[in-house]
Amino acid sequence: MPIATPEVYNEMLDRAKAGKFAYPAINVTSSQTLHAALRGFAEAESDGIIQISTGGAEFLGGQHKKDMVTGAVALAEFAHVVAAKYDITVALHTDHCPKDKLDGYVRPLLAISAERVAKGQNPLFQSHMWDGSAETLNDNLAIAQELLAQAVAAKIILEVEITPTGGEEDGVTHEINDELYTTVNDVVRTAEALGLGEKGRYLLAASFGNVHGVYKPGNVVLKPQLLRELQDAIGAQYGKNDPFDFVFHGGSGSSAEEIATALENGVVKMNLDTDTQYAFTRPVADHMFRNYDGVLKVDGEVGKKNTYDPRTWGKLAEAGMAARVLEAAQSLRSAGNRLK
């Protein structure tokens, strides 16, 4: 299917919220990880979200220049071509972008989509994320207001992170502590600044103990029930049921119960990166260990071309990551819910 239009993306999010499921949002760093994500969605009969972080975009831009916009645009254009061959619908999204990278990433990408829309085309990306969690809430929301207006003009949805997610994501680091929980006051101020849809649709990455990366059980206390408190507080104030479209960050390693509670409380998008990175790399490591004397030229031998051919181990990597995407779609209840 073609990449989602703005109208289709809104329909996807509406369906997820009404059906209490969420889309896996899979970080990709290459054409191969893109195909792995698309394959996983297709095998799950699930629509989904493909996302590119600042680090991923820089990597995609090549190690010679390391240009984030070049990398993001190149993969997005590639995705528009190859996604049409899969019988599912995906939206393209850019992941965490802090203040010091806005001018080199999100703002130029917004401008590119605005130009496309002015010509009667669809935007290149369907949503962008502004991560102002390292800023004061006042500064965070002021920048969010500016970006939301630009996003609306380009027919794009903005994702906003108002409070920190723990751990490290592309150089943005937050300690694991009590600051990892969004308060009612935080969302009151967010609703006052950004509205509840009348100024433009946005996705809200609220914090309920989330942590990026890998962590041992017991080190992190997730409280997805907090999302219900936030929904109800603002809903009562504005007379709207479940006013927020929530995003679940730092979702790798979450329990089935934690995910289910988050879905019941308005999560429509859940990010996966750490788990899919491992799922992609693990089969490659296995192949290298099992075939080291073919991959390497050992003891004067010449190795075996079919063992070090990137296509050989690349197919294993794609299959491994696709299986993890399929598993995510099942956990998030999006499996079998593709648009038809």
Kindly give the residue locations of the regions a language model identified.
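N-terminal amphipathic alpha-helix/helix-capping segment at the start of soluble metabolic enzymes
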Residues: 1-24
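Short, conserved beta-strand segments within well-ordered enzyme catalytic domains
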Residues: 25-27, 49-51, 91-93
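Catalytic-face loop-and-helix region of soluble metabolic enzyme cores
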Residues: 83-84, 211, 216, 226, ...
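Extended, intrinsically disordered, low-complexity segments
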Residues: 290-340
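Alpha/beta enzyme core
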Residues: 7-15, 31-87, 99-242, 256-261, ...
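Glycine- and other small-residue-rich loops at beta-strand/loop junctions that grip anionic moieties
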Residues: 26-27, 133, 176-179, 216-219, ...
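Glycine-rich beta-to-alpha transition loops that act as phosphate-gripper elements at the mouths
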Residues: 28, 92-98, 244-254
